[in-house]
């Protein structure tokens, strides 16, 4: 009888998995984006060391992806309690997977665009604006996942 009111004992497992998925997948995307963009910056800085600070933008944008996952993971962790329902814990799992997997995809996109964009900007500075626009569109992919995750986790 208490199971219907509070949910089964294993219900919190799914919410914890949602928090873990949010952090792990978004951090993987951010790490890939940082590493891929960072190698492009390192290669470019040999030829054009004066452009290092201008080229750091993809690395910063990749790091923001991890912050999205952190926000959702903290929201999920703060909403955990002993009597969480199975419905609520599945919502938390969905929220974590939403922000995590969209962060992974956004991190991959930011890394690839950042690497090619930084190398191209070193040779042709007019490519900088185009690189920034493409990076913004890649970052928005992670933002969409964050919005869906916030809607799910606060439901």
From Swiss-Prot:
Side Cytoplasmic, residues: 34-55, 115-131
Tissue: Expressed in brain (at protein level).
Processing and modification events after translation: Ubiquitinated by RNF182, leading to its degradation via the ubiquitin-proteasome pathway.
InterPro entries: ATPase_proteolipid_c-like_dom (IPR002379), ATPase_proteolipid_csu (IPR000245), ATPase_proteolipid_su_C_euk (IPR011555), F/V-ATP_Csub_sf (IPR035921)
An annotated GO BP: pH reduction
PANTHER family to which the protein is assigned, alphabetical: V-TYPE PROTON ATPASE PROTEOLIPID SUBUNIT (PTHR10263)
Similarity field: Belongs to the V-ATPase proteolipid subunit family.
Protein name according to UniProt: V-type proton ATPase 16 kDa proteolipid subunit c
Organism (species): Bos taurus
């Amino acid at each position: 009888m208490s199971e219907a009111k509070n949910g089964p004992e294993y219900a919190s497992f799914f919410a914890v998995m949602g928090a873990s998925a949010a952090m792990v997948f978004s951090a993987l995307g951010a790490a890939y984006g940082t590493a891929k963009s960072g190698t492009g910056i390192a290669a470019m800085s040999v030829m054009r060391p004066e452009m290092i600070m201008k080229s750091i933008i993809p690395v910063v944008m990749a790091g923001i992806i991890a912050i999205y996952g952190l926000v959702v993971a903290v929201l999920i962790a703060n909403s955990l309690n002993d009597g969480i329902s199975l419905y609520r814990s599945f919502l938390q799992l969905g929220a974590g997977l939403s922000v995590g997997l969209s962060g992974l995809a956004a991190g991959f996109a930011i890394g690839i665009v950042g690497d090619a964009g930084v190398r191209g900007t070193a040779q042709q500075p007019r490519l900088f604006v185009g690189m920034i626009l493409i990076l913004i569109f890649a970052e928005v992919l992670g933002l969409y996942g964050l919005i869906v995750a916030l809607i799910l986790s606060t439901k």
